[in-house]
Structures are given as C-alpha cells and as structure tokens.
Amino acid sequence: MSEENQVNAADTQATQQPVLQIQRIYVKDVSFEAPNLPHIFQQDWEPKLSFDLSTEAKQVGDDLYEVCLNISVETTMESSGDVAFICEVKQAGVFTISGLEEMQMAHCLTSQCPNMLFPYARELVSSLVNRGTFPALNLSPVNFDALFMDYLQRQEQAEQTTEEENKDVH
C-alpha cells in the first residue's frame, strides 16, 4: 500500500511541473511593398526606419496557446520622404503551456514565447528586404522580459491612478 501512495505522490508532482513546449511555428501573414521602385534606387540611400512590434496570444485548446509576434518595418528616404519599403510579418506559434500560475502564464505568453518566435521573424524580414534588393536589414535583439516588466509597471500606475481618482470622487 505504501508503494502505491509513493507512486501516486510522484504522479501528482509530475503533473504539477510547468510545461512549455513548441508544437508548431509558422508564418501567419506576410507583406512586402516597395511602392516607389525602381526610381527609389536612383536616390542616395539615406533611410529613416520605423519599427513596430506587438504580440497577441489566445487559447486554442486545452493547454494550447497561439502566440503571434507582429513586426512592421517602414523605411522612408530622409531627403524625399518617399517610402522605400514596408515589411509586415506575423510570425506565430502554437505552444503547450501548463502548470503555471496567472503571472507566470502572462510572462510566458508575452515574453518567453515571443522570444522563441523572434529569430524566425527577424530572418523573414531580412530575407524579404534582401529580395527587394535593398541593403541588408538586421533587426536588433528584443528584450521581451524588459517589455513585460514595463507593461506591468504601466498597469500598476494605471491602477494607482484609478484608485486615486475613485478616492477623489468619494
């Protein structure tokens, strides 16, 4: 009987262990536009780069989550303001995630999973820009942990502001 209890205790501990597994990584959407070709190549290459990044996450099954990393890069010419190119990539993945508390789950979905997706998205952006025969564009690494901490601080400040406004009303 004691052996059976030990086995059940071991099974319980095993099921409570945090799990994060990649099931699939894929391109959900991609767009590359170079509206001013070929005359843009006749200008001096003095680009002004605009970079936007966001993430989305949704549950798609039991312990299955889709995380999408959205990257948008727009390059315009400093001198003329002409758009050289616009590159938009939605790199996504399905992850098995379990055994996490609420804050750990939020960190996993907004930091750890996007961190796994970023190299794929960065390579795709680089490849698309290269196929447009523009100079190489290598996106710098992103610190998703710092972005998550910044998000938490903004949320905390917003909650404090709301509490202060509610105190002023009463």
UniProtKB/Swiss-Prot annotation:
Single annotated GO MF: unfolded protein binding
Family statement drawn from the similarity comment of this UniProt entry: Belongs to the SecB family.
Assembly information from the UniProt record: Homotetramer, a dimer of dimers. One homotetramer interacts with 1 SecA dimer.
Principal location: cytoplasm
Gene3D superfamilies cross-referenced by the UniProt entry: SecB-like (3.10.420.10)
Stated name of the protein: Protein-export protein SecB
Organism per entry: Pasteurella multocida (strain Pm70)
Domain of life: Bacteria
GO biological process: protein folding; protein tetramerization; protein transport
